[in-house]
């Protein structure tokens, strides 16, 4: 319960407070994290945002900024691998009322690296999903995430993050990148695997 409350607080701060204009200014250099049209990409934090996370003394969330045109809604889905196929295990769907929308997605994780919560900030609202920690523990684990800008194609899922857990210390882990894991679940040999995707829906 403590982790769940902390995750909810962190998600609210990350998305409601930190989105701002999405323009980034760093020491000695000036860059922008504003994504291009119909693009989702890893966010770059301002110094103020980084200082806020340090003040909270929590693990830094994984952040993505996006810009999308012509979408009627979005769907965030959490999948768990079962018998070589991805099975839905949670998610959230919301409408989009703006023809040209910019926003930010924040993912938080537990001490063992597993998914703990997600927040979606766009316009004036923030939606959140929190997940209680799994009771089973893994001896080793690995995770991967989307590292480069990705073109948003309406009605096609975009894999943002993948997690792999092993129950035996001697087991080797092949940590596929999220896009490969989404398309090739039958190749995953880990004892446990989880995947998060986002899909922007076309109008009509």
Model-identified regions with their sequence ranges:
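Mature, Sec-exported extracytoplasmic domains of Gram-positive
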Residues: 26-204
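C-terminal motif of bacterial Sec signal peptides marking the signal peptidase cleavage site
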Residues: 17-21
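Bacterial N-terminal signal peptides that target proteins for export
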Residues: 1-10
């Amino acid at each position: 319960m403590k982790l769940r409350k902390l995750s909810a607080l962190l998600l609210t701060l990350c998305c409601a407070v930190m989105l701002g204009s999405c323009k980034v200014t760093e020491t000695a250099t000036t860059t922008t994290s504003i994504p291009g049209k119909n693009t989702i990409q890893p966010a770059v934090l301002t110094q103020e945002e980084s200082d806020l996370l340090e003040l909270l003394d929590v693990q830094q969330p994984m952040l993505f900024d996006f810009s999308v045109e012509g979408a009627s809604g979005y769907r965030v889905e959490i999948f768990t691998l079962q018998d070589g196929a991805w099975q839905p295990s949670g998610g959230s769907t919301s409408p989009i009322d703006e023809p040209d929308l910019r926003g930010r997605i924040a993912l938080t994780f537990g001490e063992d690296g597993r998914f703990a919560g997600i927040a979606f900030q766009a316009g004036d609202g923030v939606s959140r999903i929190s997940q209680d920690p799994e009771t089973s523990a893994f001896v080793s684990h690995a995770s991967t995430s989307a590292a480069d800008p990705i073109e948003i194609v309406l009605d096609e899922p975009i894999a943002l993050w993948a997690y792999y857990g092993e129950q035996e210390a001697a087991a080797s882990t092949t940590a596929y990148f999220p896009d490969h894991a989404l398309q090739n679940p039958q190749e995953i040999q880990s004892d446990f695997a989880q995947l998060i995707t986002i899909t922007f829906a076309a109008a009509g």
